[in-house]
Amino acid sequence: MPPRAKKSLGQNFLKDRNIAARIAAQLHIGPDDWVIEIGPGPGALTRHIHAAGPARLFLLEKDHHWAREHRLHPLAGTPEAQVVLTDALLFPWERLDAAHPWKVIGNLPYNVASPLMWDICSRAPGLLRASFMIQKEVGERIVAAPGSRQYGALSVWLQCFTKPEWCFVVPPHVFTPRPKVDSAVLAFTPRTDRPDAVQSKRLARVLRLCFQQRRKQLQGILRPHVGGDASALLAGLGIDPAARPETLSPERFIALGEAVAMSAIA
């Protein structure tokens, strides 16, 4: 009998083969792709990923039991998968350079999904596509439009770096143990105009400032952090100084991050 899912690792194992096949299909795997699966567990997704015929397959597994199982007893037809015992939150995603076409997939634990997507989508320069199953509520935040209740820092960040695509909803009964909420599958295609390393740091800072006080006006939020008149800075960008953070588009946040950084050192 396989071990029980570990609550400490946020494990909910997918048991529906049709759903697993649909998730793997969202990655659009080709024969030249190098694929990373996060948290393969018993291998529900792994089978379908391998069947798609990628050039290389890497399994990132934090659970010692499942890492050992994949090494000692690889799934039928998957002997060349490379198993890496690691925490995906600590993985050096910046090493996924453009020398290879990288694609990343996973049924992400609810408790670490947001920081994982934040890092992967912004730090992996060679990323071609990603497909993740996450909590439905988090998925709704990611694709939320400016001005909506769900729109926040995660929405802006991921929309600056990728084009998120809502794929489909996954009900609780296809997992063991059964979660209390619905899941959703989203796919991510990197933008060609995504922020560079310097812009990323500035964007992260301004998002942190703004969404920690999302109900305040932007001029009030930024006043302690700019070298001059916050209202004038915002007006110069075509932004209403009385606007609140959730009304700005991702593109406006990139511009605001640059302006705030320049103002602070002027």
Curated annotation (Swiss-Prot):
The keyword ATP-binding does not apply. GO terms for cellular component: cytosol. Transmembrane segments: none annotated. SUPFAM superfamilies: S-adenosyl-L-methionine-dependent methyltransferases. Keywords: Cytoplasm, Methyltransferase, RNA-binding, rRNA processing, S-adenosyl-L-methionine, Transferase. PROSITE patterns: RRNA_A_DIMETH, SAM_RNA_A_N6_MT. It catalyses: adenosine(1518)/adenosine(1519) in 16S rRNA + 4 S-adenosyl-L-methionine = N(6)-dimethyladenosine(1518)/N(6)-dimethyladenosine(1519) in 16S rRNA + 4 S-adenosyl-L-homocysteine + 4 H(+). It holds the Pfam family RrnaAD. It comes from the Bacteria. S-adenosyl-L-methionine binds at N12, L14, G39, E61, D87, N107. Specifically dimethylates two adjacent adenosines (A1518 and A1519) in the loop of a conserved hairpin near the 3'-end of 16S rRNA in the 30S particle. May play a critical role in biogenesis of 30S subunits. NCBIfam families: ksgA. Belongs to the class I-like SAM-binding methyltransferase superfamily. rRNA adenine N(6)-methyltransferase family. RsmA subfamily. This is Ribosomal RNA small subunit methyltransferase A. It comes from Nitratidesulfovibrio vulgaris (strain ATCC 29579 / DSM 644 / CCUG 34227 / NCIMB 8303 / VKM B-1760 / Hildenborough) (Desulfovibrio vulgaris). The gene is rsmA.
